[in-house]
């Protein structure tokens, strides 16, 4: 099972893979939240540290996040690190080294709810921008959605951004606490 966070409109792949990219900052839409270009990246790391699978579809492009063991040598010690990687599928098949390690954000991005709130906030931001400052109609008709889905429902939807987070007890608690 996965939690699906879906919004109309296709986020750029770089919004999940390039630190500092924010399409919401200075967008001119009242109520938009995002601005720093780091939230998605921190959210991905929280989930990877928790051992949860995350799959993102930016339209038809699939993003699978994983880590690769590496070692940093500063001349005094050799420190093992886990580099965060993104394997693309669909419209591209390359693997991107994202340029940060799993410990990025580990001191202050510590809870599953923080990562889930980030994805939901980004979905609302995009919907606000896509729908001329309104998100309630998209929520009511299902274009903007935060719902559990079974594994076989994990797939792309043209014209949409879809974030799938592996469902565990912590993710389910977050879903249960959402306003109905």
Give the location of each predicted region:
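GHKL (Bergerat-fold) ATPase N-terminal catalytic module, capturing the glycine-rich phosphate-binding loop
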Residues: 1-180
